[in-house]
Amino acid sequence: MDLGINEISLGDTIGKATADEVRYDNKRIKPESNTRIILLNKPNGYITTVKDPLKRKTVMDLIDNNKRLFPVGRLDKDTTGLLLLTNDGELANRLMHPRNQIQRIYKVEIDKKFRAWEIKRMANKVYIGQKEWGKAEVVEQKQVKGRVTVLLRLYQGQKREVRRLMYRMKRKLFSLERIQFGPIALGKISRGRWRDLNA
């Protein structure tokens, strides 16, 4: 599928001089030299947290030498795909700040295609409950047998935003995977595996 956006390979380091840059307030976000950034392909069933009082499986269980690392944002327990972890709190805050408008690309499997008016509605805004509004751009949708694969581009990163949007749009959601964060693409890294982007 063509995302219509530039990607970088997993071997590229954030902060390296490339045409694709992550920016905040129109300034390039550049981590400190001692900053560690991990890209994890999160599997289903793992909690996105550093410690869980209920002793459930967390994303930290998947990473060796995870001292001082913490997730940049969250993915639900049942959501898979690209999750960044870092030891740089300032960098994490900049990456998550709504003003930064950093895109997230999700691949969702649903029961039926979106019609033109529904695509337009989601690109504007949809009330998703709790006095919050969600929005998403439909990059591409493709039907295979009884299911539809849709690529969605979001910028806000509200809690469970995609799931709440699908509920409001009356779509049955079969799977949800994040495949891109800013210019960083998930690529071919296996589920449950991770890569140090500073290497």
Language-model segments: residues:
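Basic, flexible Lys/Arg- and Gly-enriched helix-loop patches that mediate nucleic-acid binding at interfaces
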Residues: 1-199
